[in-house]
Amino acid sequence: MSEHVGERTRPTSLRYDDVQIGDELPPLEIPLTRTLIVATAIASRDYQDVHHDPSLAVERGSPDIFMNILSTNGFVGRYITDWAGPDATIRKVAIRLGAPNYPGDTMTMSGSVTAKEDGVVEVALR
């Protein structure tokens, strides 16, 4: 979705009435490189060695460095706003820690609209 503004194209946002319970969000795949994992940890000011030092990550019981939860949260926000548009406001994100994301993994997100009430749309990600 987009609208033309002069010669530029501006993304448009979904409206409440555009969204129905059961609507599926398009999947998003993010290849996770060592550089991405380190850069996003630094960008979120998470200097824990398990996010940038492979030998110390192994010493602490991990097979390699792994992505921090703040980076995961940021990618979730990007996923939702890429779908809903620039006018969307994320009111709440609830993430459960599961399997870590390591270099070479692909982070795949998908989701669906699970509820609508009083102008608020709820989306569950998988």
Model-derived regions: residue spans:
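Hot-dog-fold acyl-thioester-processing enzymes
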Residues: 2-89
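Hydrophobic beta-sheet segments that form the core/acyl-binding groove
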Residues: 88-126
